[in-house]
Design a protein with these regions (language model features):
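A solvent-exposed, acidic/Ser-Thr-rich amphipathic alpha-helical stretch
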Residues: 27-93
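Short, surface-exposed coil-to-beta transition loops
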Residues: 71-73, 107-112
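Short, cysteine-centered beta-strand-loop-beta hairpins and adjacent loop/turn segments enriched
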Residues: 94-105, 136-137
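Acidic/histidine-enriched, glycine/proline-rich intrinsically disordered or flexible terminal extensions
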Residues: 136-155
Length: 155
């Protein structure tokens, strides 16, 4: 059976809770969104197994500037059924300007590639991959040089 409207709403609610928990350093609420055997990959850093979500968020929170960042997840593409699905999402991470003015800059433009499972009626993240907006997502473009260079890569 394909994803129901209720499933889609519950998954979008999970991502809203994820964004809020991550942006407010709520480690317990963040960890509650993942399975015990979760795998999290963020640009080459891998966390897996029990405690993966807690370990990942603690590592991320220790980065300079983390306290001024918000985590925006939007426009999910969901494919699956009532027991599991794959999700692809756009990601933006604005942060307060470090010079103290009431302005912001963007720390990250990227995308998420996730696998979710439904356990006892609750959707949870079992695989969570965070990447910059470069590489394979741009392979369909004949000219990627500008995007690659601006994202810190090579054309």
């Amino acid at each position: 059976m394909s994803l129901t409207t209720h499933d889609r709403y519950a998954i979008r609610d999970l991502y809203a809770r994820y964004s809020w928990a991550r942006s407010t350093a709520d480690i317990d609420s963040f960890a509650a969104l993942f399975t015990q055997e979760a795998v999290i990959e963020d640009e080459g850093h891998r966390f897996d197994g029990p405690g993966a979500a807690t370990d990942y968020l603690r590592a991320w929170l220790s980065r300079p500037g983390a306290a001024g960042q918000q985590y925006w997840i939007m426009q999910q593409v969901l494919d699956g059924d009532s027991t599991g699905c794959e999700a692809r999402s756009f990601l933006m991470t604005p942060m307060l300007n470090p010079i103290g003015t009431p302005s912001m800059t963007f720390y990250r433009f990227g995308h998420l590639s996730d696998r979710l499972v439904k356990r006892e009626g609750t959707w949870l993240l079992s695989e969570h991959r965070i990447d910059q907006w470069r590489g394979e997502v741009l392979e369909g473009f004949p000219r990627r040089d500008i995007a690659m260079v601006s994202a810190g890569g090579t054309p």
